[in-house]
Swiss-Prot record:
It catalyses: tRNA(Ala) + L-alanine + ATP = L-alanyl-tRNA(Ala) + AMP + diphosphate. Its EC number is 6.1.1.7. One of its GO terms (cellular component) is cytosol. The gene is alaS. Coiled coil: none annotated. This is Alanine--tRNA ligase. It comes from Vibrio cholerae serotype O1 (strain ATCC 39315 / El Tor Inaba N16961).
Length: 860
């Protein structure tokens, strides 16, 4: 029987709903209140506190289709993705859970029923494993389910491992909840190599685990003793990709409908024909994790979850580049993904535009350095004498070209090499140590190069100019000529290019002659010289050549806005938090600004809001940004702030923005504060003891950020409104059911007056809105009769009278209810067959209802 992945998902959830389980939505990929976990990687993550007894929910049975990511930390599948049939960065885990409700027998019976009755898998294709001492689970499988003993495998502890160190024994840690588990395997047939679990050939692909049932029945103490839990629980997980492969008659997860759709979409976006290529599998997998991480609020960055996302994006982009992708392609897969995910893609559809934009920008940014980085990596591999690429080269690719180490490892592995991971980590640690010692941003580029040139900087007033090449260096050695492809450092006699300093990154652009073009990828200080780092894109270049030096004006303009905003931010922080605030580092780029400052505690939401208000106030005032050259002592006397870690000459450049900010600064700035447009803080957090970090965006970047936040907010509001409406409906349904139940009990209180059925009763705490339905039910049951009900709820009296149509010529409901209402401090009326009223005197209600019989008798 063929089933699509979406059909499998819906069948699983519906089956367990029929067994009394509450369907719970997938939680975010960013775990809530669990700092130990990088990403949600199992269905049980959102129920962790339920299993630990720290949280009680309205249900004791739950079922989910949980989105999971394994691409960082302990559970890291990234390096295997695309190279095996079943490794993914993103997957969905189907699960059913019992929190002290049912246990082993029901869990096993449910699993077997779903697999063999709902999915109709051949029983002879299934075999199971149990923990070696779990006789209870063995007997359930054997005697209750009927699986032959030779298809139930006992799995013990790993050789040389600790007690309970087994694939069939689950434990949260050295202490705490733990217990045995039973796993269900599917036999793909003897045409595929591999043996059953526990055999020497168990790593083959013939027998594939499809479902794991964990039985949390013990609490392990520090001394190793196992105490039975008073309410044992069940945690199960079944990867939807694996079971879908079986239902679709394929062996590899990448052959199921979801991946085939994405592989075809990737091939179309890239312009590649061979759908069996492994790189397409990598791209198809990675779009799932990247898209859903962004949906759940993770954005590409150089830290934490954001860096894992960046690594995955760059790995996908590199594989697309390998297949010949021209321009950005990765973001084009978001639409096909949203469609093929079916019921699991609803949220992605809502945020599709945001996800596409984030991916496109990230891909374009990486694309600027990808080709050159690949060229350097391939050259290094070509020249390799052994089989291991040194850690320094791996680090250089990471540090200069944004190549994550696992991306470099992928390329090396494709060519039969490996990387020196230990050497890379050592280089990383050395960089961290330099950063700690310096207490600021920036790296000492080419410290061994010595230049005799004193470059004149002319970039404050111009972004292009005529210059002469004074010196050129390749890999630290001075050269006189350069040709196409050479990566080099060029020193000019004068330059409009700003060298990285004071946290502002260096300019990029081009150096042009009639004979060649040099792409400047970075600009750094080299003693008194300014070093242009880059590569010869075409032609040749020689010492003494005259060049047109042209800065990337758009990028510089964006940087200048962020730099000016940094000054306003610094001043605003000192006004809001206090004069103790001092800059401890900064990074000003075209996309964002980052500002580190001294402060002992996290900023409150109110403080962040006030800082933003002050900065934007100064932006709207549109101060002219003025610069003056003066003696450093004079500058300090005027209150100019000096930047942390910077060295100053006797004569300094003082930058002023009205009377709000005055700082010593040699950077490039906007002309007026109004040019900044808008300032928005996007994050605030601690990076070390007493050091906080703010990241912010300006201008169009701020607008883009706000648009993205608004999109997420709107989606959440819509979701909450829909849930609230559903809850209101469910509450009313429950009230109606309760009223119907109460009306069934009232029928026994019917009396006869002059041969007519009469029911007079008082209720307490009933829902007044439900009384009308209750009277309708009673009228239907009596066929002929008169009903008068009084109810006291929250100190108020509710009255309702009902008369069947055959009696309205004698007794009218409106008159009856008004008679009672007048006695309880109210009044009312209505139709002859149905009328309602209210009152304020609850104490008078019993006597008022006692008067009803006589009133009715007078009219019959």
């Amino acid at each position: 029987m063929f089933m699509s992945t979406d059909e499998v998902r819906r069948a699983f959830l519906s089956f367990f709903e029929s067994k009394g389980h509450q369907i719970v939505e997938s939680s975010s990929l960013v775990p809530a209140n669990d700092p130990t976990l990088l990403f949600t990687n199992a269905g049980m993550n959102q129920f962790k506190d339920c299993f630990l007894g720290l949280e009680k929910r309205a249900y004791t049975r739950a079922t989910t289709a949980q989105r999971c990511v394994r691409a960082g930390g302990k559970h890291n599948d990234l390096e295997n993705v695309g190279f095996t049939a079943r490794h993914h960065t993103f997957f969905e885990m189907l699960g059913n859970f019992s929190f002290g409700d049912y246990f082993k027998e029901d869990a096993i019976q449910y699993a077997w029923e779903f697999l063999t009755d709902v999915l109709q898998l051949p029983k002879e294709r299934l075999l199971v494993t149990v923990y070696e001492t779990d006789d209870e689970a063995f007997d359930i499988w054997n005697k209750k389910v009927g699986i032959p003993a030779d298809r139930i495998i006992r799995i013990g502890d790993k050789k040389g491992g600790k007690k309970f160190d087994s694939d069939n024994f689950w434990q949260m840690g050295d202490t705490g909840p733990c217990g045995p588990c039973t796993e269900i395997f599917y036999d793909h047939g003897d045409h595929i190599w591999g043996g059953p679990p526990g055999s020497p050939e168990e790593d083959g692909d013939r027998f594939i685990e499809i479902w794991n049932n964990v039985f949390m029945q013990f609490n392990r103490h520090a001394d190793g003793t196992m105490e039975p839990l008073p309410k044992p629980s069940v945690d199960t997980g079944m990867g939807i990709e694996r079971i879908s492969a079986i239902m679709q008659g394929v062996h590899s997860n990448y052959e199921i409908d979801v991946f085939q759709t994405l592989i075809k979409a990737a091939a179309d976006a890239i312009g590649y024909q061979d759908l069996t290529n492994q790189s397409l599998r990598v791209v198809a997998d990675h779009i799932r994790s990247c898209a859903f991480l962004i949906v759940d609020g993770v954005m590409p960055s150089n830290e934490g979850r954001g860096y894992v996302l960046r690594r995955i994006i760059r790995r996908a982009v590199r594989h697309g580049n390998k297949l010949g992708a021209q321009g950005a392609f990765f973001h084009k897969l978001v639409g096909p993904l949203a469609e093929v995910m079916g019921t699991a893609g609803v949220e992605l559809k809502k945020q599709q535009a945001l996800v596409e934009k984030v991916l496109r920008i990230e891909e374009e940014n990486f694309g600027r350095t990808l080709d050159r980085g690949m060229s350097i990596l391939n050259d290094a591999l070509d020249q390799l004498s052994g089989q291991v690429l040194d850690g320094e080269t791996v680090f250089k690719l990471y540090d200069t070209y944004g190549f994550p180490a696992d991306l470099t490892n992928d390329v090396a592995r494709e060519r039969g090499f490996s990387i020196d991971e230990a050497g890379f980590e050592q280089a990383m640690e050395e960089q961290r140590q330099r950063a700690r010692e310096a207490g600021q941003f920036g790296t000492d580029y080419n410290s061994l190069i010595k230049s005799a040139t004193n470059t004149e900087f002319c970039g404050y007033t111009a972004s292009r100019g005529q210059s002469v090449v004074r010196e050129m260096f390749v890999e630290g050695a001075e050269v006189s000529t350069l040709s196409a492809g050479d990566k080099a450092i060029i020193v000019l006699d004068n330059t409009p290019f700003y060298a990285e300093s004071g946290g502002q990154c260096g300019d990029t652009g081009v150096l042009k002659t009639d004979a060649g073009i040099f792409h400047v990828e970075d600009t750094q200080k080299l003693g008194n010289a300014i070093a242009h780092h880059g590569v010869i894109a075409q032609g040749v270049l020689a010492t003494g050549d005259q060049v047109d030096a042209i800065v990337d004006e758009k990028r510089r303009a964006a940087i200048s806005l962020n730099h000016s905003a940094t000054h306003l931010l610094h001043a605003a922080l000192r006004k809001v938090l206090g004069e103790h605030v001092a800059q401890k580092g900064s990074l000003v780029r075209a996309e964002t600004l980052r500002f580190d400052f001294s402060h002992l505690e996290a900023m409150t939401a109110a403080e962040i809001k006030e800082v933003e208000r002050l900065v934007n106030q100064e932006v709207r005032r549109n101060h002219s940004i003025e610069t003056n050259i003066m003696n450093i002592d004079e500058a300090k006397a005027k209150g100019a702030m000096a930047l942390f870690g910077e060295k100053y000459d006797d004569q300094v450049r003082v930058l002023s923005m009205g009377d709000f900010s005055t700082e010593l600064c040699g950077g490039i700035h906007a002309s007026n504060t109004g040019d900044i447009g808008l300032f928005k803080i996007i994050s605030e957090g601690g990076i070390a003891a007493g050091i906080r970090r703010i990241e912010a965006v300006t201008g169009e970047g701020a607008l883009d950020y706000l648009d993205a936040q608004q999109a997420q907010h709107d989606a959440k509001v819509s979701e909450m409104a829909a849930k609230a409406k559903l809850l209101e409906k469910e509450i009313q349904q429950l009230k109606d059911k309760l009223a119907a139940k109460e009306s069934a009990g009232l029928i026994n209180q019917v009396k006869q007056i002059a041969g007519v059925n009469v029911l007079v009763a008082q209720l307490n705490g009933a829902d007044n809105k439900a009384l009308r339905g209750m009277v309708d039910d009673l009228k239907n049951q009596l066929s002929s009769g008169i009903i008068m009900l009084g109810n006291v709820a929250e100190g108020k009296v509710g009255l309702i009278a009902g008369v069947t149509n055959d009696l309205t010529n004698k007794v009218k409901a409106g008159e009856l209810v008004n008679m009672v209402a007048l006695q309880v401090g109210g009044k009312g009326g209505g139709r002859p067959d149905m009328a309602q009223a209210g009152g304020t005197d609850a104490h008078a209600l019993p006597s008022a209802l006692e008067s009803v019989d006589a009133w009715i008798a007078e009219r019959l």
